[in-house]
């Protein structure tokens, strides 16, 4: 198990927020960060601190991306026309692991990354094992036939609610999803407030 994967339960505590809206999040039990000194009095945060925090939240939400992965995504967002903050969110939501998570084929974004990396997913009928693969509008994402009876998938599908994001269409029984358009920030169902505009300020400073 990677260090980034094993540290997922510390992300909520470090941020002081329940990033994924999980009932068992440690933030639900206490409102301070990890470590024995986590309960110190809060100090006023600088503009840079707010920007850094916004970046760490967004990185953490998508499976604790590495700085290299995240900065490359930001650079691509900055090169594109339009609002860089909106572009950044659109690119993150276009990741294959993000779409697998949004389609509720697996319970967490961490599980989605592992699921893709282990070759359980196809895009337009071809197996893709790169979690950061950038899906295009019209792409059809599906769970491979031989992977459909995995306990992870069956439990996720059985326990998930049937409401899905408006930018994907999902055939829950067929374990298939179509990426119909790149979302705007306001459409992404983040359980907590994300501030990609502060991320833009972080990289611009």
From Swiss-Prot:
SMART domains: Ribosomal_S4 (SM01390), S4 (SM00363). Residues 1-46 are annotated as: Disordered. One of its GO terms (molecular function) is structural constituent of ribosome. Residues 94-154 form the S4 RNA-binding domain. One of its GO terms (biological process) is translation. It comes from the Bacteria. GO terms for cellular component: small ribosomal subunit. SUPFAM superfamilies: Alpha-L RNA-binding motif (SSF55174). Pfam families: Ribosomal_S4 (PF00163), S4 (PF01479). Keywords: Ribonucleoprotein, Ribosomal protein, RNA-binding, rRNA-binding. InterPro entries: Ribosomal_uS4, Ribosomal_uS4_bac-type, Ribosomal_uS4_CS, Ribosomal_uS4_N, S4_RNA-bd, S4_RNA-bd_sf. Coiled coil: none annotated. NCBIfam families: PRK05327.1, rpsD_bact. One of the primary rRNA binding proteins, it binds directly to 16S rRNA where it nucleates assembly of the body of the 30S subunit. Part of the 30S ribosomal subunit. Contacts protein S5. The interaction surface between S4 and S5 is involved in control of translational fidelity. Belongs to the universal ribosomal protein uS4 family. This is Small ribosomal subunit protein uS4.
């Amino acid at each position: 198990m990677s260090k980034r994967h094993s540290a997922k339960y510390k992300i909520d505590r470090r941020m002081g927020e329940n990033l994924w809206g999980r009932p068992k999040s440690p933030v639900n039990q206490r409102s301070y960060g990890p470590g024995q000194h986590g309960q110190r009095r809060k100090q006023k945060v600088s503009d840079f601190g707010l920007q850094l925090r916004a970046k760490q939240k967004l990185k953490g939400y998508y499976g604790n991306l590495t700085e290299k992965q995240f900065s490359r995504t930001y650079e691509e967002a900055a090169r594109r026309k339009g609002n860089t903050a909106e572009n950044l969110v659109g690119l993150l939501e276009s990741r294959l692991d993000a779409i697998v998570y949004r389609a509720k084929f697996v319970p967490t974004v961490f599980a989605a990354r592992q699921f893709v990396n282990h070759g359980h997913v196809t895009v337009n009928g071809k197996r893709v094992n790169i979690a950061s693969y950038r899906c295009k509008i019209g792409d059809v994402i599906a769970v491979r036939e031989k992977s459909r009876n995995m306990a992870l998938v069956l439990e996720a599908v059985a326990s998930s609610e049937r409401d899905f994001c408006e930018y994907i269409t999902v055939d829950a029984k067929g374990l298939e999803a179509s990426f119909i358009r790149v979302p705007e920030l306001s459409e992404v169902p983040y359980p907590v407030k994300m501030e990609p505009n502060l991320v833009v300020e972080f990289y611009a400073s």
